[in-house]
């Protein structure tokens, strides 16, 4: 679109984590940021020098979460090392940040509200008393609502619409989001494969009891509103053919399909009972270790204009 070639550098997570070891609790604009700038700018300056460029810069200069003085200090030092100029205009002065917001909204661009560092994000979400759901990554690789993967999917669709000349509008929706932190079931002190459906919750992180009632294909535990279904029932409702629950755990269908399964099992959109899929229904006492999060959230939705 701009005619500028994008050169992607190595996403060197391991070495970055080693470099900032001991600085995990540093605040935004602190020593950890300085270490990060030095590493990033050295790679950028080196590449600019290789390409024969006379100057380099950084999009971090537009971020209200970063120190302009700190950025300029790091950039100038690396520029001197490679004998090139670090361009550091103050994009924020004269209401520059507000202008950025206006333009981003006008052009329907995604605007990230954190710097991208997992330590900075964690502290920011703690201050906001919000779940850092950007750091959740299901072992099933399922794309969950308002996850980074969901945003990538949305904006890829946006590019498709742009290429096809389809008119669209990106709007925001407030909704109830959910994330599973961990979950497993024990029978006779042995962990059995188990899969928890979306919007499953448990009052505490631990429950134990026995399944004492079956109505149709739904099996009820005698405590904490917990319910079980067999893999056979799951396959029937999802129109899938998983051979084992373990296979299901590592390769779940889409979040939307699992929501439909839940709604078929319990015809109540407000129900937050824990619903667990197992290979076979346990006949002896069992233990459940489970933690999930239910929280208000906002997501972007793309609407086709006809």
Regions found by a protein language model. Give the residues of each.
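Generic structural hydrophobic/aromatic packing signal, biased to beta-strands
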Residues: 6, 44, 75, 86, ...
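ATP-dependent adenylation/nucleotidyltransferase module used to activate substrates
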Residues: 1-60, 64-75, 81-89
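Charged, low-complexity, helix-prone segments enriched in Lys/Glu/Asp/Gln
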Residues: 19, 37-41, 72, 94-104, ...
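A polyampholytic, Gly/Pro-enriched intrinsically disordered region
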Residues: 26-34, 104-120
């Amino acid at each position: 679109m701009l005619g500028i070639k994008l050169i992607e550098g190595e996403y060197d997570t391991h070495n970055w984590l080693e470099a900032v070891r001991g600085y995990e609790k540093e605040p935004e604009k602190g020593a950890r940021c300085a270490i990060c700038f030095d590493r990033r700018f050295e790679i950028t300056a080196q590449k600019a020098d290789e390409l024969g460029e006379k100057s380099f810069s950084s999009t971090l200069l537009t971020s209200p979460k970063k120190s302009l003085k700190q950025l300029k200090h790091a950039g100038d030092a690396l520029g001197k090392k490679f004998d090139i100029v670090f361009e550091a205009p103050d994009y924020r002065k004269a209401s520059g940040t507000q202008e950025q917001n206006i333009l981003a909204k006008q052009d329907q661009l995604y605007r990230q509200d954190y710097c991208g560092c997992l330590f900075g994000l964690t502290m920011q979400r703690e201050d906001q008393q919000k779940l850092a759901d950007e750091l959740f990554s299901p072992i099933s690789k399922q794309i969950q609502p308002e996850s980074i993967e969901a945003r990538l999917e949305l904006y890829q669709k946006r590019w498709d619409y742009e290429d096809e000349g389809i008119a669209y509008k990106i709007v925001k929706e407030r909704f109830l989001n959910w994330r599973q932190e961990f979950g497993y079931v024990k029978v006779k002190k042995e962990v059995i494969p188990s899969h928890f459906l979306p919007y499953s919750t448990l009052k505490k992180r631990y429950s134990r009891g026995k399944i004492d009632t079956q109505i149709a294909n739904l099996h009820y535990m005698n405590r904490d509103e917990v319910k079980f279904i067999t893999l056979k029932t799951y396959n029937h409702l999802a129109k899938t053919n998983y051979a084992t629950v373990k296979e299901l755990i590592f390769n779940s269908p889409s979040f939307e399909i699992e929501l439909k399964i839940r709604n078929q099992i319990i015809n109540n959109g407000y129900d937050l009972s824990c619903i667990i899929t197992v290979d076979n229904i346990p006949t002896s006492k069992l233990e459940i270790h489970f933690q999930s999060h239910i929280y208000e959230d906002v997501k972007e939705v793309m609407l086709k204009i006809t």
